[in-house]
Regions:
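Electropositive
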Residues: 57, 61-93
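Well-ordered beta-strand positions in beta-sheet-rich domains
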Residues: 38, 59-61, 82, 140, ...
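Post-signal peptide N-terminal segment of mature Sec-exported envelope proteins
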Residues: 36-58
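Structural motif
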Residues: 45-47, 82, 123
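Exported/periplasmic cell-wall-interacting domains
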Residues: 34, 72-77, 93-212
Length: 212
């Protein structure tokens, strides 16, 4: 078949160029990373800070691993270092929506339901960007909701970062795919510029308030 016989009507250099431009434009939009927001998680403090253009705007209590920090397979530890948001799962789902293997089960679990500890409400799936957290995505390291909200602020997870459902929904609705997530084993005030003093920060964290 000749090249002429496969040429589409209107397939001029101008038309082809316009098509490629639009294709690249929409592909770029679909894959554009969130560079405005950053999340910093302190294992030491069991706290998470949300930054907007590097300015802290909210802090929340969290729960990291009961086994400490690390990233090897089967360790059930929370990885340290620079990561990014790879996927977001659970748009619009009611608080307490149960997920298994990142799929909704159809069940909704209440806060502090006795004997229940599934992943609930939303899933923010993290991908490691460094050697020290290269296994994070394969290990299914998430920021996710938990029914056991009474334990938030204590290290009781199996590697993930747990949040209260209401706090998680706030965070989920702000950050986009590609946003950086930094996990450190230091106090937040040591790594985030512009945080309030320790006493004010403690009040802010307990109440779940923003800190504009």
């Amino acid at each position: 078949m000749s090249a002429a016989s496969t040429k589409l009507a209107g397939d001029t250099p101008v038309a082809t160029g316009a098509f490629l431009f639009l294709l690249l434009f929409f592909t770029s939009c679909a894959t554009q990373k969130d560079v405005q927001h950053r999340v910093v998680i302190s294992v030491k403090d069991q706290k998470l800070a949300l930054l907007d253009r590097e300015t802290p705007v909210a802090i929340y209590p969290v729960s990291t691993s009961k086994y400490g920090v690390g990233d090897w397979q089967g360790s059930y530890r929370t990885p340290l270092g620079e990561l990014e948001i790879a996927q977001k799962i659970g748009d619009g789902m009611p608080p307490g929506t149960v997920f298994k293997d990142r799929r909704r089960t159809g069940e909704i679990v209440g806060v502090n339901a006795p004997g229940r500890d599934p992943i609930v409400t939303r899933i923010i799936w993290l991908r490691g960007l460094e050697w020290q957290n290269v296994n994070a995505f394969r290990r299914d390291i998430y920021i996710h909701g938990t029914p056991e909200e009474r334990n938030i602020g204590l290290p009781v997870s199996y590697g993930c970062v747990r949040m209260r459902s209401a706090d998680l929904i706030q965070l989920y609705d702000v950050v986009g795919r590609g946003a950086r997530v930094t996990i450190v084993d230091q106090p937040l005030v040591a790594v985030v510029y512009g945080l309030p003093n320790a006493a004010q920060a403690a009040l802010t964290i307990r109440s779940g308030m923003t800190i504009h």
